[in-house]
């Protein structure tokens, strides 16, 4: 049975837009995905008919909103195959989730003489918090280097791991190169060395099924807005024994058990002690609707369609003169490229004139740009609502730019 891409596209109202007099070809979902009507409607319905502050409310609307929020926590647990919903913390997104780990678990567990291992392909969100932790603690930051083809030099991992390695933090799929890292293998090696592992799943959850128990990762984090959900909501998964031992990061309402000016404060159990203040309940409701949406389509069917679309795109882009592609042949979700000696911003601006939206810049991955010795790249994203016709428009646009600019 073929993937119902036209039916899917009909659920995304923005895809009916025109840009510069041409139909929008939105190839920027790796930055942020568009939202289907089902997500938009779910959040609107909540604000129109069901909104109230969650926790401790005796009235019906508050109790209902609290229950709906906790139902989504249970839903996310099933989506990730977590053992318990109490292993999941609602955060603003991947960046906040990583910072939470660095500032709670990291401050308690990482000390002078210890080390943290990351990779050369990481998003800044999975670099800077660890740099800051190392500066605070006196720990060392170690880096798994890249190969030119965009894969990791995994043969270097054994030499980087030792008895003082506290954490390996790695992206599951590169936001620039589309490299799908062998995270299960890396997790197993890290655990043999006694280290914990954090997986940045921001570029993975929309492309295929995630099973945190099978991966055996200690931390897993993703953002809702890349999963066709709202902005400002994400999820941090932490193995229950680790999460219950972590000290709170932010103080305020909802994360306490008792507060006394003379006796001090006691804290709620996890995950609620990591959710200070009024949560983004509307965003949580929207995230639940997004998970419903992709689950109904089936992540296996989505993965199969996207893999076919990627093969088509790579074959067609091979016909563009002076086009440099970055990353491995086997990639997921994104294609990074430059056209001749033209700056990525110029290429992206021309493509926008043709109604084709791509991302340009360093993609929050400046160490990766330094490795390839370029200031910027263009990046086209391919997801479940994209089509071969949109790929054709990208290729035609690139050929036209090459002809115009030489």
UniProtKB/Swiss-Prot annotation:
Keywords: Cytoplasm, Lyase, Pyridoxal phosphate, Transferase
Compartment(s): Cytoplasm
E.C. numbers: 2.8.1.7, 4.4.1.16
GO CC terms of this entry: cytoplasm
Keyword field contains Cytoplasm: yes
Classification via SUPFAM superfamilies: PLP-dependent transferases
UniProt xrefs under Gene3D superfamilies: Aspartate Aminotransferase, domain 1 (3.90.1150.10), Type I PLP-dependent aspartate aminotransferase-like (Major domain) (3.40.640.10)
Biological process according to GO: cysteine metabolic process
PROSITE patterns: AA_TRANSFER_CLASS_5 (PS00595)
GO MF, one example: pyridoxal phosphate binding
Modified residues (N6-(pyridoxal phosphate)lysine): 226
Pathways involved: Cofactor biosynthesis; iron-sulfur cluster biosynthesis
Cofactors demanded by this protein: pyridoxal 5'-phosphate
Active site: 364 (cysteine persulfide intermediate)
Catalytic activity: (sulfur carrier)-H + L-cysteine = (sulfur carrier)-SH + L-alanine; L-selenocysteine + AH2 = hydrogenselenide + L-alanine + A + H(+)
Family, similarity comment: Belongs to the class-V pyridoxal-phosphate-dependent aminotransferase family. Csd subfamily.
Function per UniProt: Cysteine desulfurases mobilize the sulfur from L-cysteine to yield L-alanine, an essential step in sulfur metabolism for biosynthesis of a variety of sulfur-containing biomolecules. Component of the suf operon, which is activated and required under specific conditions such as oxidative stress and iron limitation. Acts as a potent selenocysteine lyase in vitro, that mobilizes selenium from L-selenocysteine. Selenocysteine lyase activity is however unsure in vivo.
Assembly description: Homodimer. Interacts with SufE and the SufBCD complex composed of SufB, SufC and SufD. The interaction with SufE is required to mediate the direct transfer of the sulfur atom from the S-sulfanylcysteine.
The protein's name in its UniProt record: Cysteine desulfurase
Organism: Enterobacter sp. (strain 638)
Gene this protein is translated from: sufS
